[in-house]
């Protein structure tokens, strides 16, 4: 059966159901904590998060890194969690705090080293009265998964998923950790943070991001790295960390977020009982700091990355600003996942290797950024200049500035944003992060529920107005250049030679024993119903597996062909070109992308060692038309020679930088250890042969791959 008829048959086989109702509840506890409960009974679990409205932007100027340090030590227990004998541990803990204060007053390295050894001895002594890692073990005991935390510029989150039957235990331990916390093992966590700092210092991607933020935000704390400055990391004070906790971790600065299979009416009394015992703290008065405003064109350069890149930075708006959604639409008009944007055309036409536009709206300020990677000429072994790239990017940008786009293009962009929102709403975790962001910025909870209506309401005149207002002649041009050798930024943080800390293996605190004994009403187990996955044999080489989406009317479909790069090495490059292909006889890539966009659909091609994939998502009402359009492209792909030359240049440039990339070297070594001569790095097309790739050959390779057996997942 030909692919066109195959996809149309699939489209007619499927039946659709409306999404299930969900409910968002919001309340404030007596101590000021904000509670969000998003009920979704279709989920098997609950995602729980405690989010604090504090991040690295709130670090004291002379003690940067405290927010991140605190995230690490918040897992070290309290006067009950991890405590085997707090009365004996307490005086040792207080000595450790005093020793760090004593150390901070010294400048002599030898004297500091002597105190470090004293602290190490005290830490080893205190460890005899602590169970060690008990919070994590309690989460494991209740069936929790994905325990983690993260520190950002404006907020800090602690979270994991857990079975609905374990709600009381989760509320108990997450509230208990906020009552009399004990920052045990501070010294060992310093080692972990030092290693993290050194890792970022060696990573060119991290160094590039730091450079961009330093230049974009000037004197604002957003310009500092989240992990902190090295001179402050080398001079830690536990007392300062305790002060930071007491200042920022009060309930009025905290949100409790529960998303998934939960009943708000049953949960609220338990939440009150557990979290209202967390003591209210003094009100916080946060001073908003001024943000750098660009005037005219400002240029900065740095040799820090694997390859050259141009970044154009414009002043934007803070999160929750009335113009934020309109600016999101502007960025989508420039570049988007469907590759229908004004800047996307530069990549589709082969004029530039890669380009994208994005908005980063944070609590105090925001920036708009355009990133562009020049093309690499494999024949001349050189990159295009930053100047030429900036010229063609600005030329395309003028189309946005001048409002050169129509209603149809705008509506397709808005529908794509709505579809991506619907996909996010399928995830408990994504919902929780969105709620945490709303809490952090003080936005109304209705913003998340009414997001689709807000997007639909944005008019073409509003988009044109903000495009002209923000994408103006006042911007920062960052010429990021290739670094042959990356010098260390400042001094690497040397890991101290401490004696290892040994805790009592297998020991449990009385608190842990009590938590584990809390009775649980086991829910009715809902096993996966494999019969709900319907199967249809399309022909001798194609089989369809499909199931209904209970969440919404968004579909995802994957065609999985039984051939990969192990047997067809050139397929890697054929598939890469298919992602930017047009359609014979005369449909150009951008026209094809926009035709898909008008159907609210998105299609991507991928390949691995053993399989080739064609993936499409969209709305069910447009499934038949989207399948018809996709099948025509698969049958009659129009690959572009200019794109091929850009792809070859990209491969040449990428391989040139491999020996300077720690991550790539690690990957190559691991691959060789596992597979020896069958390693992907040894089996790939030699660099010297890339120049001989042709459109005819790659088209033939792709079409041959579509003749292999195919499984379709809907």
For each predicted feature, which ranges?
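Carboxylate/His-rich catalytic cores and anion/metal-binding grooves
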Residues: 194-204
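M16 family metallopeptidases and their MPP-like homologs
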Residues: 38, 43-59, 65-66, 83-176, ...
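Bacterial N-terminal signal peptides
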Residues: 7-15
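Bacterial N-terminal signal peptides that target proteins for export
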Residues: 1-7
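A conserved hydrophobic secondary-structure block that centers on an alpha-helix together
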Residues: 233-244, 580
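Catalytic glutamate of the conserved HExxH
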Residues: 69, 73, 329, 573, ...
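Non-catalytic, conformational "gating/processing" segments within enzyme and secreted inhibitor domains
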Residues: 183, 190, 205, 209, ...
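Proteolytic maturation boundary segments
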Residues: 21-34, 263-302, 344, 447-561, ...
């Amino acid at each position: 059966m030909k692919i066109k008829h195959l996809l149309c048959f699939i489209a007619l086989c499927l039946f659709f159901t409306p999404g299930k109702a969900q409910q968002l509840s919001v309340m404030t506890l007596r101590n000021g904590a904000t509670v969000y409960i998003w009920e979704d009974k279709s989920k098997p679990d609950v995602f729980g998060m405690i989010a604090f409205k504090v991040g690295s932007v709130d670090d004291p100027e002379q003690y940067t890194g405290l927010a991140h340090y605190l995230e690490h030590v918040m897992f070290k227990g309290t006067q009950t969690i991890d405590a085997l004998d707090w009365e004996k541990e307490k005086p040792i803990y207080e000595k450790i705090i005093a020793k760090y204060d004593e150390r901070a007053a010294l400048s002599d390295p030898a004297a500091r080293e002597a105190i470090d050894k004293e602290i190490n001895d005290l830490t080893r002594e205190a460890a005899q009265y602590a169970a060690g890692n008990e919070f994590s073990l309690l989460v494991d005991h209740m069936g929790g998964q994905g325990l983690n935390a993260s520190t950002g510029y404006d907020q800090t989150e602690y979270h994991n998923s857990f079975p609905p039957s374990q709600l009381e235990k989760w509320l108990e331990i997450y509230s208990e950790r906020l009552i009399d916390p004990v920052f045990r093992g501070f010294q060992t966590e310093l080692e972990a943070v030092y290693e993290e700092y050194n890792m970022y210092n060696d990573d060119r991607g991290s160094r590039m991001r730091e450079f961009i933020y330093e230049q974009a935000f000037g004197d604002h704390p957003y310009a500092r790295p989240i992990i902190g400055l090295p001179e402050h990391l080398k001079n830690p004070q536990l007392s300062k960390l305790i002060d930071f906790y007491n200042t920022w971790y009060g309930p009025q600065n905290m949100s409790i977020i529960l998303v998934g299979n939960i009943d708000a009416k049953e949960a609220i009394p338990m939440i009150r009982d557990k979290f209202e015992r967390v003591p209210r703290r003094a009100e916080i008065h946060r001073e908003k700091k001024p943000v750098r405003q660009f005037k005219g064109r400002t240029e900065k350069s740095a040799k820090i990355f694997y390859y050259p890149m141009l970044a154009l930075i414009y002043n934007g708006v803070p999160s929750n600003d009335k113009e934020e959604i309109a600016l999101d639409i502007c960025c989508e008009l420039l570049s988007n996942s469907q590759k229908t944007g004004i800047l996307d055309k530069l990549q589709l036409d082969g004029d530039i290797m890669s380009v994208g536009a994005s908005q980063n709206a944070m609590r105090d300020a925001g920036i708009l950024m355009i990133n562009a990677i020049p093309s690499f000429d494999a024949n001349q072994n050189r990159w295009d200049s930053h100047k030429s790239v900036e010229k063609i990017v600005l030329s395309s940008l003028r189309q946005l500035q001048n409002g050169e786009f129509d209603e149809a293009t705008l509506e397709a962009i808005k529908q794509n944003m709505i579809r991506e929102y619907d996909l996010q709403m399928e995830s408990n975790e994504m919902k929780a992060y969105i709620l945490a962001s709303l809490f952090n910025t003080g936005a109304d909870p209705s913003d998340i529920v009414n997001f689709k209506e807000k997007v639909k309401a944005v008019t073409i005149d509003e988009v044109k107005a903000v495009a002209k207002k923000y994408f103006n002649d006042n911007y920062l041009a960052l010429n990021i250049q290739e670094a042959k050798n990356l010098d260390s930024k400042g001094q690497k943080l040397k890991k101290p030679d401490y004696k290892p800390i040994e805790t009592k293996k297998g020991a449990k605190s009385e608190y842990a024993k009590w938590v584990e004994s809390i009775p649980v009403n086991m829910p009715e187990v809902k096993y996966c119903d494999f019969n709900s996955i319907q199967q249809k044999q399309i022909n001798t080489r194609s089989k369809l597996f499909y199931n209904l989406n209970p969440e919404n009317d968004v579909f995802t479909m994957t065609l999985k062909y039984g051939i990969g790069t192990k047997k067809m090495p050139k397929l890697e490059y054929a598939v890469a070109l298919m992602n930017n292909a047009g359609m014979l006889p005369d449909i150009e890539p951008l026209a094809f992308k926009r035709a898909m966009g008008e159907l609210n659909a998105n299609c991507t091609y991928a390949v691995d060692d053993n399989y080739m994939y064609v993936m499409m998502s969209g709305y069910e009402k447009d499934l038949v038309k989207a399948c018809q359009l996709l099948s025509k492209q698969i049958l009659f792909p129009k690959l572009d020679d200019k794109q091929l030359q850009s792809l070859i240049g990209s491969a040449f440039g990428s391989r040139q930088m491999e020996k300077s990339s720690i991550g790539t070297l690690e990957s190559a070594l691991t691959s060789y250890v596992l597979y020896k001569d069958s390693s992907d790095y040894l089996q790939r097309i030699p660099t010297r042969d890339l120049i001989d790739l042709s459109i005819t050959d790659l088209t033939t390779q792709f079409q041959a791959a579509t003749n292999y057996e195919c499984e379709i997942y809907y």
